[in-house]
Amino acid sequence: MKKLILIITMVVSTLIMQGCEKGMDLQPQDYFDGQQLDIAKAIYDGDRPQLDKQLSSVNKEILNRPAKEEMTLLFWAINNAIYDKTTPERLKIITDLVKAGADPLQPQPNTPGSPAEFVMKADKGIWIQAMLEGGLSPNARDKVHNQPIIFESFDAANTETLKILIAYKADVNIKGAMNRTPLINALYNSCPEHIEVLLAHGANPLAKDDFNDSFLSLISAEIDKGDKSNA
């Protein structure tokens, strides 16, 4: 069963990244029971009034407790806000859950990172925007590597999630592992469009990492290599 869930999750992940319009109809009772099942059913039905009633009496422990196959209610809400279910009301359900205490940075074993990291890799910014509306900080860091979630945008097919974070006042010079900035990471990930967006919004090309390298010095070194190879 775990292998099946992993396969389904991988397919869902791929389709979210591609912005597809139709998905698998997973059922709430396949994963949840008790109070979590009531919440999951409201999410599945897209019933925000009913969800509000459930959330008014739920504690954060229940809201964030992994159910069968490590499924969480927030990831369940994401699954129910994709394909033809990508509606404003269903995106607001994601916002409602985060406002109520669902943790978008909670590591999710069956997906590439936490819900926030997962949706940062998508080719649309609507899911991360829903979390930001719920209170997620645009400068949030993952709980495993302490890496700013802005770096996850470099795995996306375009700059949509990056632009959303910036619109919500993300620090474009925030430093991650080895004190590398988003600009340096975008360079190492060969993301010219992301670099253009970062520079247009004030990213500092002179900021140095632990190796005393800056974006500008790395670019200059690459130009020098090219000049020498052409000599």
Can you annotate each of these PLM segments?
Residues 55-62, 93-103, 129-137, 163-171, ...:
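Ankyrin repeat domain, specifically the short helix-to-loop turn at the C-terminus of the second helix
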Residues 41-46, 76-89, 118-124, 152-158, ...:
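Ankyrin repeat A-helix N-terminal signature
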Residues 24-32:
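TPR-adjacent "capping" and linker segments in tetratricopeptide-repeat scaffold/adaptor proteins
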Residues 7-15:
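Bacterial N-terminal signal peptides
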Residues 31-39, 64-81, 107-118, 141-150, ...:
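Ankyrin-repeat boundary/"N-cap" motif
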Residues 18-19:
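C-terminal motif of bacterial Sec signal peptides marking the signal peptidase cleavage site
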Residues 1-4:
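Positively charged n-region of N-terminal signal peptides that target proteins for export
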Residues 50, 89, 93, 126-127, ...:
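Conserved ankyrin/ankyrin-like repeat signature
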